[in-house]
From Swiss-Prot:
This is L-aspartate dehydrogenase 3. One of its GO terms (biological process) is NAD biosynthetic process. One of its GO terms (molecular function) is NAD binding. The keyword Ligase does not apply. It is an enzyme of class 1 (oxidoreductase). Its EC number is 1.4.1.21. Keywords: NAD, NADP, Oxidoreductase, Pyridine nucleotide biosynthesis. InterPro entries: Asp/hSer_DH_NAD-bd, Asp_DH, Asp_DH_prok, L-Asp_DH, NAD(P)-bd_dom_sf. The active site is at 224. Specifically catalyzes the NAD or NADP-dependent dehydrogenation of L-aspartate to iminoaspartate. The gene is nadX3. It comes from Bordetella bronchiseptica (strain ATCC BAA-588 / NCTC 13252 / RB50). Belongs to the L-aspartate dehydrogenase family.
Length: 272
């Protein structure tokens, strides 16, 4: 029998991804991990969701999650990221961040992580080949470029649309929404481009990572094409993700968190 202690996992945010994660954890689908708490914006809906689980867990405010868990998974709107991450780091625990783009808007979180016993974890998510990019970064990376294409509905509400007075309703051909650095893109598409920021953090940084963003009525899946030129390898990758209930993100995002949690409690770990 294994002597490893079971890890308590709390889920912050009960949107499509948060609910999917909480459901799977509550059903003991990750050996060595259990759902220990949740936090949702609407008390009534949160209570209804908890009632649907095979066993009840407490619903607590964001800042109390570290008291109930070893690991907190952030699945919330980007604006509340500090409210989730700071208490976890102060408690010396781990937080898995899905709103990766928001990390660039709150650089103090990097500093706090560096001065605490806690840790910020960024899952692979939709980014095929993230391990290869981090390995390439141990040498010299010359350039990183990503081209993202999503159905227009996936960009609804993106701040850059209002800033540039862009109308994507009724598009009949691809429209270039943005071309530039990953850092600036994260501001314009806070709910859409976490994959680009994760790529930049793994490689040469958000200012040097180049990005094109297209609203494309001809695609039905979120599609990312990546090219990394380094002294160790030339990497070319294309990923087509099936959207989740939230068209801004892919179904594989929740599965990536499950895989990360599984690695953390597994006797054998595969991958960087």
């Amino acid at each position: 029998m294994s002597s490893r202690e079971e890890l308590g996992v709390a889920v912050a945010g009960l949107g499509a991804i948060g609910k999917a994660l909480a459901n799977r954890l509550a059903r003991n689908e990750v050996a060595g991990c259990r759902l220990s708490a949740v936090s949702g914006r609407d008390p009534g809906r949160t209570a209804d969701f908890i009632a649907s689980l095979p066993r009840p867990v407490p619903a607590v405010p964001l800042h109390e999650l570290p008291r109930h868990a070893d690991i907190v998974v952030e699945c919330a709107p980007a604006a509340v990221l500090p409210q989730i991450v700071e208490p976890v780091l102060d408690a010396g625990k781990k937080v898995i961040v899905l709103s990766v783009g928001a990390l660039l808007e709150f650089p103090e979180l990097f500093r706090k992580a560096g001065s605490s016993d806690g840790q910020i974890l960024v899952p692979t998510g939709a980014l095929l080949g993230l391990d290869a990019v981090t390995a390439a970064a141990e040498g010299r990376i010359e350039s990183v470029k990503m081209v993202s294409r999503k159905p227009p509905i996936g960009f609804k509400g993106a701040p850059i649309l209002a800033e540039r007075n862009l109308d994507i309703d009724g598009l009949t051909e691809p429209l270039l929404l943005y071309s530039g650095s990953a850092r600036a893109a994260a501001r314009g598409f806070p709910a859409n481009l976490n994959v680009a920021v994760a790529l930049s953090l793994a490689g040469i940084g958000p200012d040097e990572t180049q990005l094109e963003v297209w609203a494309d009525p001809g695609v039905v899946r979120n599609t990312h094409t990546i090219e990394v030129v380094s002294d160790a390898a030339l990497l070319r990758m294309t990923i087509e993700n099936i959207p989740s209930e939230n068209p801004k993100t892919g179904r594989i995002t929740a599965q990536s968190v499950m895989a990360m949690l599984r690695k953390m409690s597994a006797p054998v770990r595969v991958g960087t």
